Amino acid sequence: MKRAVVVFSGGQDSTTCLVQALQQYDEVHCVTFDYGQRHRAEIDVARELALKLGARAHKVLDVTLLNELAVSSLTRDSIPVPDYEPEADGIPNTFVPGRNILFLTLAAIYAYQVKAEAVITGVCETDFSGYPDCRDEFVKALNHAVSLGMAKHIRFETPLMWIDKAETWALADYYGKLDLVRNETLTCYNGIKGDGCGHCAACNLRANGLNHYLADKPTVMAAMKQKTGLK
């Protein structure tokens, strides 16, 4: 039996990954992390979606220690989430240091226990957000370290790594879940479901990708299929 664990926030990217994983694996587990995040409403959204889509199990892990150690606008109400600045340089204040290091490591430990062969994460380098822990080289390096530390190869899969946001919408549509991802996921840094606040970087990236996809579905769908190998 093929098993996988999805790092699942209930947002656009991880929900699209879950939808695809359910087609590719016999048994899919979801892991969601409570780190005292500003957009904590995502945890309830993740619960609802994991149940609705048919995940075998859904674990919510308490990692609130991360909140104490990692200062970010997503872990401190006193630090405002900035409006979208497409030309901004450097690492944005929404970056949570160590988040993906911790999430992927804990997901791999869970995968070890349930005998899953893969951990799936929705990180993406194409629409680079300025987060160093979304880079392909980081994921590959951590995957190697985790496999060495467990004496077991658990594969880290990044199905969205080389597709952009418009193509991510196309992927959801390919599996017949465009409306679900659009209306029932939570991507917004301010914790608003669906189209979100419309001002933060996450909302703008999501909206721009959707508009691009809806404006030229055939071209974007073809590009997504070419990059992912889907027929």
Swiss-Prot record:
Pathway: Purine metabolism; 7-cyano-7-deazaguanine biosynthesis. It catalyses: 7-carboxy-7-deazaguanine + NH4(+) + ATP = 7-cyano-7-deazaguanine + ADP + phosphate + H2O + H(+). Its cofactor is Zn(2+). GO terms for molecular function: ATP binding; ligase activity, forming carbon-nitrogen bonds; zinc ion binding. One of its GO terms (biological process) is queuosine biosynthetic process. Zn(2+) binds at residues 188, 197, 200, 203. ATP binds at residues 8-18. It holds the Pfam family QueC. Its EC number is 6.3.4.20. InterPro entries: QueC, Rossmann-like_a/b/a_fold. SUPFAM superfamilies: Adenine nucleotide alpha hydrolases-like. Binds 1 zinc ion per subunit. Keywords: ATP-binding, Ligase, Metal-binding, Nucleotide-binding, Queuosine biosynthesis, Zinc. The keyword Ligase applies. It is an enzyme of class 6 (ligase). It comes from the Bacteria. PANTHER family: 7-CYANO-7-DEAZAGUANINE SYNTHASE. Catalyzes the ATP-dependent conversion of 7-carboxy-7-deazaguanine (CDG) to 7-cyano-7-deazaguanine (preQ(0)). Belongs to the QueC family. This is 7-cyano-7-deazaguanine synthase.
